[in-house]
């Protein structure tokens, strides 16, 4: 049995690869959805990713996910530049936001899917610290302009829920794979 991660995310690769031997084949799909609800939207995108890769690897188990940061009802995507990153982080400063990940596993023609939601509270971020963080470039290619596992960990006052969800792949996905008979590596 082979697990294919339908993602180019190094964070998802690291989480899943910690437990299982995997192959990576990024899904080439538009990360957009006409669905309005954030939870349903992340699930819809994850499902599209999984289905697009499953046709190329019959018999393999496919894992796909889509993570979004939601603040005051708005989705914060990946910033296009430093100024967008700065605006996002200023908005999150001192506030609570949600990180939502939709995931989809395709195994033997069966679809297992779900949505994980984690609340994150940021401390107040001063201008000097914000500018230092922007200069690191860590905000690039990250929803909400931060990676909790990196330098941005100093922004976090608390989280309620699954830490790995905030990184990009809920640990529940690992549990689901073990239920399907995959054994974690040693």
Swiss-Prot record:
GO terms for cellular component: cytoplasm. Its EC number is 3.6.1.9. Its cofactor is a divalent metal cation. CDD domains: Maf. It catalyses: dTTP + H2O = dTMP + diphosphate + H(+); UTP + H2O = UMP + diphosphate + H(+). One of its GO terms (biological process) is nucleotide metabolic process. GO terms for molecular function: dTTP diphosphatase activity; UTP diphosphatase activity. The active site is at 66 (proton acceptor). Keywords: Cytoplasm, Hydrolase, Nucleotide metabolism. Its main location: cytoplasm. The record marks 11, 67, 149 as: Important for substrate specificity. It is found in: Cytoplasm. NCBIfam families: maf. Nucleoside triphosphate pyrophosphatase that hydrolyzes dTTP and UTP. May have a dual role in cell division arrest and in preventing the incorporation of modified nucleotides into cellular nucleic acids. PANTHER family: BIFUNCTIONAL DTTP/UTP PYROPHOSPHATASE/METHYLTRANSFERASE PROTEIN-RELATED, BIFUNCTIONAL DTTP_UTP PYROPHOSPHATASE_METHYLTRANSFERASE PROTEIN-RELATED. Belongs to the Maf family. YhdE subfamily. This is dTTP/UTP pyrophosphatase. It comes from Pyrococcus horikoshii (strain ATCC 700860 / DSM 12428 / JCM 9974 / NBRC 100139 / OT-3).
């Amino acid at each position: 049995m082979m697990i294919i991660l339908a993602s180019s995310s190094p964070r998802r690769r690291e989480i899943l690869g910690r437990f299982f031997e995997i192959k990576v084949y990024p899904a080439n799909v538009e990360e957009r959805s006409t669905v309005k609800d954030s939870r349903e939207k992340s699930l819809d995108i994850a499902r599209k990713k999984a289905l697009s890769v499953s046709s190329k690897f019959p018999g393999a188990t496919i894992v796909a996910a889509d993570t979004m940061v939601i603040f005051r009802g708005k989705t914060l995507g990946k910033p296009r530049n430093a100024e967008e990153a700065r605006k996002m982080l200023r908005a999150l400063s001192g506030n609570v936001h949600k990180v939502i990940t939709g995931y989809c596993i395709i195994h033997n023609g069966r679809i297992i899917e779900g949505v994980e939601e984690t609340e994150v509270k940021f401390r107040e971020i001063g201008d000097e610290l914000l500018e230092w963080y922007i200069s690191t470039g860590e905000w690039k290619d990250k929803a909400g302009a931060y990676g909790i596992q990196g330098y941005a960990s100093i922004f976090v006052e608390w989280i309620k829920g699954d830490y790995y969800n905030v990184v990009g792949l809920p640990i529940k996905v690992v549990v689901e794979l073990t239920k399907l008979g995959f054994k974690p590596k040693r």
